[in-house]
Amino acid sequence: MATTTSITTTYAGEFAGKYISAALLAGNTIANGGLTIRPNVKFKEVVKRLELDGIVKDGSCDFADTSTLTLTERILQPKELQVNLELCKKDFRSDWDAIQMGYSAFDNLPSSFQEYLIGYVAGKVAQKNEQNIWAGAVAEGSFDGFSTLLAADAGKIAVTGTAVDASNVVVELGKVIDAIPPALYGREDLHVYVPQNVFKAYKRHLATVGGSVQGNNQDINIESFDGVKIFMANGLPSDKMIATTKDNLHFGTGLLSDSQEVRVLDMADLDGSQNVRVIMRFTAGVQYGVAADIVTYGIA
C-alpha cells in the first residue's frame, strides 16, 4: 500500500506570528528600518506626538507656567486582510526536492514542505505589503498608504513634482531639502524616502560627474544628499518623494492577535487532487504623526 503524505497544518494566534512576521516585515522599507513598527495593535492605537514651545524662560522667584504643550493624535487602525491561494503540489515538487537534496542555492533550508509553501506565499505578501505601505488605497486587498493619506492632508509641506531623471534629480532633491523645517534638519532619523527611479537617477548623475572620485564602472554608495539620509522605498511610486523622521511614520499589525492565522490545507484527502490551499489572515496599516513635519514631492 502506497504511503500518503498529508501536509495539512494550522498555526493560529501567537503561533502564526513568525509566519505573519515573515510576510509583513520582510519588505524593503520595514526590513531596512525605515518605519516605526507597532507590532501588537489588536484593533486600533492612538499615535501621539508631543510638542512644546517657549519651554525656557527668564529666571524668577515664581513658578510661571507659560510654555505651550500641543498633543497631536492620529488613529492607527490596521485593516483585516487575508490570502486564499490554491497551489498544485507538482508545480513545486521539483524545487522542493532540489532543496532537500542540496542542489539549491538557498542557504536556509525549510524543515518541511508546508514551510516551503508558506515561505513562498510570504514572499509575495511582503512584496504587496511594501506597495501598500507607500501607495495603497482602501480597496480589495489593500489599505491606505502614506501617499493616499498625505494627499488628503492640507497640513503637509507640499512640493510640486515633475518627471525626475539624471539631468534634474539634483535640483528636484534640493527642492525637498529646502522645504524641510529647520527644527527637523540635522536630526539623526531624518530621511528622504525616494522611489527606485529617483534613486537610480541620482546614482547615474553621480557616475557622470565622477562622484566619490569613481568612474562609470565602479559602484557608488548613496547615503545622503545635502546632509539628509536617502532611503530607497521600493513601494513608493515613481517621481514621488517624502521627507520626514522615522518616528513620524508608523506601521501597525497584530503579530500576537488571536485573529492571525496561517493554514496549509492538503486537498488530496478531500477531493483526490494534488492541490494545496494556503490561507493567511492578518492585519496591517500605516499612519503618520504630524503632517507639518512631512515634506511631500509630487503628492497633491
Language-model features and meaning:
Residues 2-57, 149-161, 167, 203-300:
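Sequence/fold signature of self-assembling virion shell proteins
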Residues 88, 92-95, 194-198, 244-245, ...:
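Helix N-cap / beta->alpha transition motif
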Residues 95-96, 130, 201-203:
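Short helix/loop capping segments that flank catalytic or ligand/cofactor-binding pockets
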Residues 98-179, 296-300:
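Alpha-helical scaffold segments that mediate packing/assembly in large oligomeric complexes
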Residues 133-138, 188-195, 215-219:
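Short coil/turn segments at secondary-structure boundaries
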